[in-house]
């Protein structure tokens, strides 16, 4: 992780007033990297994640999986959620191919599924009626692919190719309105 404090972002410049955090992806090494993270919160939350990474000569892999859960949370006893009830699943496998010292490629997939339900606590508990009828439902799916190819011709000359295809689907519902959107995006960056 790289933390840049203040408005010195290369990409956003002075627009990044509070700074910027860059998450740098892990790449597999010969020594196995295995981790498990468990976290519970005072806001009725639970986080479980696992990571595995290892390189075997010409092939390597990283696999990240997580589950996040929050039960409906109303700390002020207003009868409405401050934090909605949700379940989120994330899966991110990635394959690395090392053709030679100068040529490598990686292929990855990101998949995320999330169901959220916020609003009236009684409705969320299954006790909805004319008085307890407000809710906000949000169902989201996001899937994306990652492809990178790099070839070095020398110390200063190289070519990089990066590609990503993303599918995003969201359904949002409140008692009198439903919204549904599907988005497909594609990005290709050849650089040298």
Where are each of the predicted segments found?
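Conserved small/polar residues in nucleotide/adenosyl-binding loops
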Residues: 185-191
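Short beta-strands and strand-coil junctions in structured, solvent-facing domains, enriched
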Residues: 8-11, 70
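Short coil turns and loop connectors of transmembrane beta-barrels in diderm outer membranes
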Residues: 30, 57-58, 101, 155
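Residues that define the transmembrane beta-barrel architecture of outer-membrane proteins
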Residues: 15-17, 39, 44-46, 87-89, ...
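Transmembrane beta-barrel strands of outer-membrane/channel proteins
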Residues: 36-40, 50, 63-69, 107-111, ...
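N-terminal periplasmic accessory domains that precede
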Residues: 3, 11, 15-37, 50
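Flexible loop and strand-edge segments within Gram-negative outer membrane beta-barrel domains
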Residues: 70-90, 96-98, 102-159, 166-184
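Transmembrane beta-barrel domains of outer membrane proteins
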Residues: 4, 24, 49-55, 64, ...
């Amino acid at each position: 992780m790289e933390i840049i404090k203040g408005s010195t972002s290369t990409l956003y410049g002075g627009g990044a007033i509070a700074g910027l955090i860059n998450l740098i992806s892990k790449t597999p090494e010969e020594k196995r990297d295995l981790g498990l993270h468990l976290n519970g919160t005072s806001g009725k939350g639970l986080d479980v994640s696992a990571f595995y990474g290892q390189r075997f000569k010409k092939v390597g892999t990283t696999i990240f999986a997580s589950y996040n859960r929050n039960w409906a949370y109303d700390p002020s006893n207003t009868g409405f959620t401050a934090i909605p009830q949700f379940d989120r699943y994330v899966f991110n496998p990635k394959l690395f191919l090392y053709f030679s010292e100068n040529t490598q490629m990686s292929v990855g997939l990101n998949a995320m599924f999330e169901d959220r339900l916020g609003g009236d606590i009684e409705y969320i508990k299954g006790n909805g009626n004319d008085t307890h009828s407000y809710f906000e439902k949000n169902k989201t799916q996001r899937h994306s692919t990652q492809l990178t190819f790099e070839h070095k011709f020398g110390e200063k000359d190289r070519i990089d190719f990066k590609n990503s295809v993303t599918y995003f689907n969201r359904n949002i519902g409140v008692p009198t309105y439903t919204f549904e959107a599907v988005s497909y995006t594609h990005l290709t960056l050849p650089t040298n």
